[in-house]
Design a protein with these regions (language model features):
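NAD(P)+-binding Rossmann beta1-loop-alpha1 motif at the extreme N-terminus of oxidoreductases
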Residues: 1-55, 59-64, 70, 121
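Nucleotide donor/acceptor-binding cores
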Residues: 2-3, 99, 151
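Conserved active-site and cofactor/substrate-binding residues in soluble primary-metabolism enzymes
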Residues: 7, 11, 15, 36, ...
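Short beta-strand/turn micro-motifs composed of small residues
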Residues: 8, 30-31, 103-105, 137, ...
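NAD(P)-dependent Rossmann-like dehydrogenase/reductase catalytic/cofactor-binding core
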Residues: 55, 193, 200-201, 225-235, ...
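Rossmann-like NAD(P)(H) cofactor-binding subdomain of soluble oxidoreductases
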Residues: 55, 62-66, 71-147, 166
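Internal alpha-helical scaffold of NAD(P)-dependent oxidoreductase catalytic cores
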Residues: 91, 126-132, 150-233
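General beta-strand structural signal in soluble alpha/beta enzymes
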Residues: 103, 132-137, 177-181, 235, ...
Length: 320
């Protein structure tokens, strides 16, 4: 029995607590940004509005604080949005937290000063001196995990032994875990698939989308290698696996369908998805300054088209 702290009360962070508790751990969840989160979920039924389920009775809810972070946990799980990484990084550095960290957040950061793309683990290590980081990625829809549907993910750490120790804490008969040392490749794949799922969604037929899927995989393979990741990672759970789930029906794919019909991003967002977060858009704006200047555009024409569509708010034009 281990003590696990999950930081982030959104759909994924909350769903993640379910296999952790089922594995007989003592699990606490906290939310830094929502003052009403703890109050709402501390009620008798613990109903989560995004997941549409009652969270486990044994799940503990705590107000986010420095004192909470300083308590003794065996694992701290970061399930915040990308914008929350700097916030939690500063907290972990200031409090000199040495507990094992598991990052669920997906995304990349453009460091303007050094004109370099950083993965989340690189951001935490370089900017905030956070060590002992593992990452968890793969094709996982929060609602399906919450319903205990079979879910396969991958934990990456330079030490496979460490990855297996974490797996032992959180895996169940339905939450199945693979291992990898390719931290960079897995983080790159899990981020850029949001952009490529928009591109695939832009196909106006299954025939067109399948062609875009194939070309997207080839571009993902090129970009993963460009950032020093491994080829095989693109073809694994964090690459093709996660891309399939996102393209099959996620928010990025949905936005892509509107772009494919001739809407600009802003027009589609305002008309059809005003309350939805489109991760691919956030990532596109983050990495465009680097990708459009540093990477061979001939190798990634789909990526280039989508980035230009987002940053200029013009109609999507794809040549295949």
């Amino acid at each position: 029995m281990k003590k696990i702290l999950v930081i982030g009360g959104g759909a994924m962070g909350s769903a993640f607590t379910i296999p952790c508790i089922e594995n007989k751990n003592i699990v606490t969840i906290t939310e830094p940004y929502s003052k009403t989160f703890i109050r709402n979920l501390s009620s008798k039924n613990k109903f989560h509005s995004a997941l549409k389920i009652n969270l486990p009775k044994k799940l503990k809810f705590r107000k986010f604080s420095d004192n909470l972070l300083k308590e003794k946990f065996d694992l701290i799980v970061i399930a915040l949005s990308l914008s929350g990484i700097d916030f939690i990084g500063k907290k972990l550095k200031f409090l000199k937290i040495k507990t094992s960290i598991l990052v669920l957040t997906k995304g990349l950061k453009y460091e303007k000063r050094n004109k370099k793309i950083l993965t989340i683990s690189e951001q935490l290590k370089k900017n905030y001196n956070v060590s002992n980081i593992s990452i968890l990625k793969g094709p996982c829809l929060a609602k399906e995990l919450a319903r205990k549907n079979q879910t396969n993910v991958i934990v990456a750490n330079k030490s496979i032994k460490k990855a297996k120790q974490i797996s032992k804490m959180i895996s169940t008969s339905y939450y199945l875990i693979e291992f990898s040392k390719d931290i960079i490749g897995i983080e790159v794949c899990s981020a850029i698939k949001n952009i490529y799922s928009m591109i695939i969604g832009a196909g106006q037929s299954l025939n067109a989308s399948s062609n875009l899927f194939q070309k997207s995989v080839m571009e993902m393979k090129y970009l993963t290698k460009y950032f020093k990741g491994k080829d095989e990672t693109t073809l694994g759970l964090a690459g093709v696996g996660d891309l399939y789930v996102s393209a099959a029906g996620g928010r990025n794919s949905k936005m892509g369908s509107y772009l494919g019909k001739g809407f600009t991003f802003k027009a589609a967002k305002k008309r059809f998805m005003p309350n939805d977060t489109v991760e691919g858009e956030q990532l596109a704006k983050e990495i465009a300054p680097f990708i459009l200047k540093k990477v061979n555009k001939k190798k990634i024409p789909l990526m280039v088209s989508l980035l230009r569509t987002i940053i200029t708010n013009k109609k999507l034009k794809i040549k295949v």
